Amino acid sequence: MNLHRIMVQIALVLTSVVILLGAYTRLSDAGLGCPDWPGCYGHLTVPNTAAELSVVEDNFPGMMVEPSKAWLEMIHRYFAGSLGVLIFAITLLCLFKAKAPKVVPIVLSLLVVAQALLGMWTVTMKLMPVVVMAHLLGGFLLFVLLAILYCQLKPTEFMVDWQFVDPRLRFFSFFVIAVVALQILLGGWTSSNYAALMCSELPICEGDWVSYLDWKNAFDFWNLGHHTYEFGVLEYPARMTIHVTHRIGAMVTFFCVMTYCFWLYQQSEPIVQQLAIAIGLVLLAQVGLGISNVLYQLPLSVAVAHNLGAALLIMLVSVSSYVLWQEQPGIELNIEGFKYE
């Protein structure tokens, strides 16, 4: 299955690039750089000639093409489209290969279709936060499933001997995945509501922030009736509440994931220990990036890296859980009529 593995490796790299481009596009306020989908002002590329701009004026009255933002959006779409085609190809190869995994590739292809729809709705629904958040989560899920598929294509390298692994750890891994996923949702909700700069002090927020908490409006996921959601529609109390929740979630996530890392490292299996180190390093990097976002007022490079760090964290935690559940086949010996397992 060498071809399968190579293609999945390429897909993993391409997915990380798409995640970076998506974050860069969103944080550069270029999410509506092209107001239609899948093209840009009715073109496959960004219109720039006099004739093309004349057509834009006729079909999109009152709108002005911003080339820098439009190109950011289209480059993101080109990479995302290429990733989708690659995943479809991987799925077909797996379906026609007798011993190749089937379920994960099919789910990946379905997820690509869902991501395309969410990408379209992100534009047509003018950056509605719940759609933006779902699109972000879908991209991370693609990353996770591709990593799991890679493990399935190299099964002997991602197995452990259960007698050397605490059985409670396998179930705890599910809890940690849920915690990290929830924190990613909170991060996506913070970003899509433009709430990342609502608190400028550590560890929680400045002033009497408790008296400003507005839970009702902060988590109204179906906040309808707005012509556009670009730059946010919520008032300060709601945005501040979202930001505070994300910070508290970060503290809970740090405690849970660090506990998980120490527990993983105590196991005797080398691959489990390696994953523990990798998860711990990414977690510490995420904390540093999150603090830097606050101290330096959300620099673009740091914010984009924070997005990729979140994707790496959920991927590594998910892979560690997968590995913990892959039991290494027992070794059978027959010596003079006796059978040992």
Roles of regions detected by a PLM:
Residues Y24-D36, V113-L136, W189-E201, R239, ...:
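Interfacial helix-loop-helix junctions of multi-pass membrane proteins
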Residues L92-I106, P167, C261-I279, E336-K339:
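Membrane-interface helix-loop-helix junctions at transmembrane boundaries of multi-pass membrane enzymes
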Residues I6-P38, A178-T190:
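N-terminal signal-anchor transmembrane alpha helix
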Residues I148-F172, M315-E341:
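A juxtamembrane structural motif centered on a specific transmembrane helix
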Residues A30-E73, A196-Y236:
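Extracytosolic (periplasmic/ER-lumenal) interhelical loops and adjacent juxtamembrane/interface segments
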Residues A238-L295:
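Helical hairpin unit composed of two closely spaced alpha helices linked by a short loop
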Residues W71-A89, V130-L142, T241-T259, A303-L312:
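Membrane-interface loop-to-helix entry segments
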